[in-house]
UniProtKB/Swiss-Prot annotation:
One of its GO terms (cellular component) is cytoplasm. It comes from the Bacteria. It is found in: Cytoplasm. Gene3D superfamilies: PRC-barrel domain, RimM. GO terms for biological process: ribosomal small subunit biogenesis; rRNA processing. Binds ribosomal protein uS19. This is Ribosome maturation factor RimM. The gene is rimM.
Length: 198
């Protein structure tokens, strides 16, 4: 069975005719119209987005079978999922967040660092967050220089630790993940595609 990927979250009702605010986690917000039925995480409920239009930072959507405000309000907060195999294939150096989360992280020397916890973008580029077995998480630029290898088949990413981090003890690693400095500016960025964090 294909892994489920969260592609949208239903927000508050919009108007009195059953429309809802819909936050999507896809590169193209309107792509949710083309994925077919979307389900809850447990698969117990299925929804189809009949139509949608873009608003400020979300969509205003009509869900098939939802015809009044009361029905729309009952859906508030629901996350909507699609099987991974329904999503488009990625290009080289392009990855879905869900495919990266959980991968083992190790240094170029083969030392284990932990697991990929999340991919963030705070406006200055993509950041990979790695959770070590203990201690604070590492936040590193998700660039070709810092993450030279993404091995989805092998279930791992290889990390070239920036010079300012290498050799630091765990107590000083709180600021180690700062995307500033040479590592953030070096080489080209990778391109994780949002599809939900899961």
């Amino acid at each position: 069975m294909s892994k489920l990927i969260c592609v949208a979250k239903i927000g508050a009702a919009h108007g009195v005719r059953g429309e809802v605010r819909l936050w999507t986690f896809t590169e193209d917000p309107l792509a949710v119209l083309h994925y077919g039925p979307l389900t809850t995480k447990d698969g117990s409920r299925s929804f189809e987005v009949a139509k949608a239009r873009e608003a400020k930072d979300h969509l205003v959507a009509t869900i098939k079978g939802v015809t009044d405000r009361n029905a729309a309000e009952r859906l508030n907060g629901l996350e909507l999922y699609v099987p991974r195999d329904r999503l488009p294939e990625t290009d080289d150096d392009e990855y879905y967040h869900a495919d990266l989360i959980g991968l083992a992280a190790e240094t170029t020397a083969g030392a284990p660092l932990g697991r990929v916890l999340a991919i963030h973008n705070f406006g200055a580029g993509d950041i990979i967050e790695i959770a070590p077995p203990s201690g604070s998480t590492l936040m590193l630029p998700f660039t070709n220089a810092v993450v030279p290898t993404v091995d989805l088949a092998g279930g791992r990413v290889i990390i070239e630790l920036p010079a300012e981090i290498e050799g630091e003890d765990q107590d000083s690693s709180d600021n180690a993940g700062s995307p500033e400095g040479d590592a953030a500016a070096s080489n080209s960025a990778r391109h994780p595609r949002e599809s939900g964090d899961p």
